[in-house]
A protein has these predicted regions:
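Long, low-complexity, serine/threonine/proline-rich intrinsically disordered regulatory regions
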Residues: 3-5
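Active-site metal-binding core of divalent-cation-utilizing nuclease and nuclease-like domains
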Residues: 7-9, 13-56, 60, 171
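Redox-cofactor binding/interface segments in oxidoreductases and associated redox assembly factors
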Residues: 40, 63, 90
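Residue-level detector of flexible, active-site-proximal loop/helix-junction positions
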Residues: 45, 68, 117
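Active-site ExK catalytic segment of metal-dependent nucleases
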Residues: 60-67
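Catalytic cores of nucleic-acid endonucleases
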Residues: 69-113
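Non-catalytic C-terminal interaction segments of nucleic acid-processing enzymes
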Residues: 109-208
Length: 208
């Protein structure tokens, strides 16, 4: 499915804003990819990803450039997205569709969002390729310490309770094959409960 129109309430002029795009975009992605989890406003280095889509074995960055946005920060955002995510998409309003390829790397996917009379039409203009700049040592930093602990337990690794988080990350990277670790990271992000994380972190501190 490359193109699909979704019907949502939005502003009546022809300009698409970020707030108009998000909800129908996420539904479109869920229909396209199947089982996914969408995490909004994810801190990504010194930038903030508009959204991150977690699949069974990949984490995909999503940057939204609505008709009201400019390219002013995009170069810097691209750098940080490419540090952390397996693939990346930029989603653009029609005002950007003609020139967006000039502003993102060739491996980035491009989705256009166009306002129709009865909804928003999404079209996958370019499929995302595997990000050649991705680094597992950066991707693993997306996880919190309790999530690393669960990965250690499932893979029968020492607890390293007295060691720093960076040391634990390095041991996991050294001991777990990369293909398996992609799935482990996705599993933790799928199960992440933001309402419980403070309690989990406090419980971990008390166990040390």
């Amino acid at each position: 499915m490359n193109a699909h129109t979704l019907r949502f309430a939005y502003n009546k002029d022809m300009t698409l804003y970020d707030r108009d795009i998000r909800e129908p975009l996420f539904q479109w992605l869920e229909e396209k990819y199947g089982m996914v989890r969408i995490i909004e406003e994810k801190q990504t280095g010194k930038a903030r990803a508009d959204a991150v889509m977690v699949t069974v074995d990949e984490v995909i960055g999503i940057e939204i450039k609505s008709d009201a946005d400019t390219y002013a920060r995009l170069e810097n955002q691209v750098k940080y997205y490419d540090w952390y995510y397996d693939r990346n998409y930029v989603v653009v309003g029609t005002s950007h569709a003609l020139h967006i390829e000039e502003h993102v790397p060739a491996w980035w996917g491009i989705i256009t969002a166009e306002k129709e009379a009865d909804g928003i039409d999404f079209y996958e203009m370019r499929k995302p390729q595997v990000n050649p700049k991705r680094k597992m040592k950066r991707k693993i930093t997306l996880l919190w310490r309790p999530e690393l602990v669960r990965i250690q337990k499932r893979n029968h690794l020492p607890a390293y309770k007295e060691k720093a988080k960076k040391f634990v990350q390095e041991r996991i990277l050294a001991k777990i094959p990369e293909e398996q670790l992609h799935r482990e990271i996705s599993r933790e992000l799928f199960e992440r409960d933001y309402t419980l994380i403070e309690a989990e972190l406090e419980e971990y501190r008390q166990r040390k």
